[in-house]
Amino acid sequence: MKSQFLLKVWVVCVGALLCRCGGARAPQNTGGTKAVEDYHIGVMTGPGSHSSHDVVAAKRACAMYGAVGDGHRGCILHVTYPEDFVNRQDETVSRLLAFADDPLMGAIVVSEGIHGTAEAFNKIRAKRSDIMLFVGDPHEYPELIQKSADIVVSDDYAFGGYAIPWAAKKMGARTLVHVSFPRHLSKAELRTRRQVMEAVCADIGIEFASEEAPDPAGVRC
């Protein structure tokens, strides 16, 4: 489900970029070689060990629109943030800043706006104001990332607390299991979403269960 959501985010970004460029253009091919797009879209996701669904979605995006270097309609450039992103924030920032060194870069999409995203976006904005900046799921303070990004897609955590149980029931679920870990639940927004989920489950008649998983970043709270 999350990979489908991320694909939709990227499709929106591609559509927005095409609109900004004056609409979709037919590839120009004056010789026997394949045409190449005149813009790139940078995508940052978590590594496979943290969020394999993000990597799968990125590969699908590359399959749909072509990866940079493919030669034919290659416009997606995919990187991951560091495994130990909690202690390597500077590396996250540098990987995002590297996108702005590409003169063809037109938009940057970060699936999960971990710490360092807002800082990187502010630096990119100062260097390349023409690049559009998108975040799927913000992990920094919403007010902070909203000031630096053009669009933050999933910033209404309370609504998610309502929508997820209703969607689960519509799909036939009788139990909703909320899986998280202390680092995430230390954030007020995520605690609120969990509380709303539990209350909504009680209202609509499905069982709510809560489980704790190991922190993929190896952090112990």
UniProtKB/Swiss-Prot annotation:
InterPro entries: DUF3798 (IPR024258). Pfam families: DUF3798 (PF12683). Gene3D superfamilies: 3.40.50.11400. This is Uncharacterized protein TP_0013.
